[in-house]
Amino acid sequence: MAGHSKWATTKHKKAANDAKRGKEFAKLIKNIEVAARTGGGDPAANPTLDDMIKKAKKASVPNDNIERARKRGSGEEAGGADWETVMYEGYGPNGVAMLIECLTDNRNRAATDVRTAMTKNGGNLGESGSVAYMFSRTGLVMVEKGELSEDDILIAVLEAGAEEVNDNGEKFEITCAPGDVPAVREALVAADIEVDDTDTDFRASVEVPLQADDARKIFRLIDALEDSDDVQNVYTNMDLSEEVLAELGED
């Protein structure tokens, strides 16, 4: 997969269609609430909250919903849930390792939803630690290329903890330790470079190459998992060639 973004394949994003729009809104709102609770309700002093609000606005979440979530998280308004992050591990069809990240206020419900989706779509839930050792957590910062060069990005972020700068076509992807994401973001802002997105990803040390039909099975399983309101992200170790990606793009 040289030259192609793992962002698009190891972390499958929901299609932005009307049927899934409401669920995506709910997940973005949940992230705002958690960010405000963890780091305070002032976006200027809480880079994570600022990023979450920008993501929600980019997805056209109404401003009223964003503001209420921020206030619930910071304690300015009552009604915030007791969210916790839970990771589930397992295998999909063809031995593809999967990490399922949930943000939930009910562990039993989340576990049931994940187990049901896995069982019905050719996967199986594993014990804690069964696949996590194959993945390492990585911080990601995305920048629109525009007129920028790779050197422009490197000069701005090298002292802030950046590890690599990858050219993904329309964007540069900067990788770093998860804890260095705020510093990399701030270094870019200081250099008058606009940050498009920040995130954390789980990258696999060993990947499983798949043909298009097998990849479709994994994506069906991911869609079933993401039908649960508790599931935030799904990470896999599948490896898709440019040819397979092109074939999937025709679906």
Swiss-Prot record:
GO cellular component, one term: cytosol
GO MF terms, alphabetically ordered: DNA binding
Alphabetical GO biological process terms: regulation of DNA-templated transcription
Primary localization: cytoplasm
Pfam family, one: TACO1_YebC_N
Family recorded in the similarity comment: Belongs to the TACO1 family.
Protein known as: Probable transcriptional regulatory protein cauri_1421
